Design a protein with these regions (language model features):
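Short hydrophobic beta-strand immediately N-terminal to the Walker A/P-loop
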Residues: 35-37, 49
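The feature captures the beta-strand-to-loop junction immediately N-terminal to the Walker
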Residues: 38-43
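Walker B catalytic motif
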Residues: 173-177, 184
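Conserved beta-strand-loop-alpha-helix hinge in the C-terminal portion
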Residues: 220, 224, 228-249
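ABC ATPase NBD Q-loop/coupling interface
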Residues: 64-80, 148
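Conserved structural motif at the start of ABC-family nucleotide-binding domains
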Residues: 7-9, 22-24
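ABC-family P-loop ATPase nucleotide-binding domains
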Residues: 93-170
């Protein structure tokens, strides 16, 4: 059904510094679906996530992107976030001097303002924060720490899943979230993603490896190679990639 389409990408081409990275990407994501985008290094996976999030260093040269029927490419990065798009970075940045509590309070209330809602009252915000921290198994003392400063790789990724839980996006884009994680951290990240997934929401999981997809089971798997999606199938494609590699698909 057309009304269950969350994201529709047609003929998307994008470049950075006059170098074309995406060379005609077509992708349709429906509500309730988890899509995995796999591919070799340099295929354009992170460029795709950056273009969807609206990072300014990338120039869209052709194609259309609709999110819930709206022209996504016409929106600013802030408007995309307010509309319900969340991007989890491969390398989360450190923000010295800013506690997680203050960072999240600003982010949550900015999202609410973008939707025409009043800021959360202090008590309601702290209650929400406690619930979501417990949800992703973050210790309460993390709230007082500076954002990602001195965090291990696993703590940084867990913090991002916590941010995702707080902002409650309609479309979550996880860009190589499994990078540098041990198995325990991987399980926690995956369980958080799975628990946040509902029939009205969707996720794009961008990864180079199979192991994350042992814990987050995709409905659809795409192989992105040289800026184009060259193969789309069900979750069985993950095992085929593991067996044959990208060159022999």
């Amino acid at each position: 059904m057309a009304n269950d389409i969350l994201l529709k990408i047609e003929g998307l081409r994008a470049s950075v510094e006059d170098k074309e990275i995406l060379k005609g990407v077509d992708l349709t994501i429906r509500k309730g679906e988890i899509h995995a985008v796999m591919g070799p290094n340099g295929a354009g996976k992170s460029t795709l996530s950056a273009v969807l999030a609206g990072k300014p260093q990338f120039t869209v040269t052709a194609g259309t992107v609709e999110f819930l029927g709206q022209d996504l490419l016409a929106m600013s990065p802030e408007e995309r976030a307010w509309a319900g798009i969340f991007l989890s970075f491969q390398y989360p940045v450190e923000i010295p001097g800013v506690t997680i509590t203050n960072f999240m309070k600003t982010a949550v209330n900015a999202h609410r303002a973008g939707k025409g809602l009043e800021p959360l009252k202090a008590g309601d915000f702290l209650k929400l924060m406690r619930e979501k921290m417990a949800f992703v198994q973050m210790k309460p003392e993390f709230a007082k720490r500076e954002v990602n400063v001195g965090f291990s790789g696993g703590e940084k990724k867990r913090n991002e899943i916590f941010q995702m839980a707080m902002l409650d996006p309609t479309l979550a884009i996880l860009d190589e979230t499994d990078s540098g994680l041990d198995v325990d951290a991987l399980r926690i990240v995956a369980s958080g993603v799975n628990a946040l997934h509902t029939p009205d929401k969707a996720a794009i999981v961008i990864t180079h490896y199979q192991r994350l997809l042992d814990y987050i089971v995709p409905d659809v798997v795409h192989v992105l190679k040289d800026g184009k999606i060259v193969k789309t199938a069900g979750k069985e494609l993950v095992a085929e990639i593991e067996e044959k590699g990208y060159d022999n698909l």
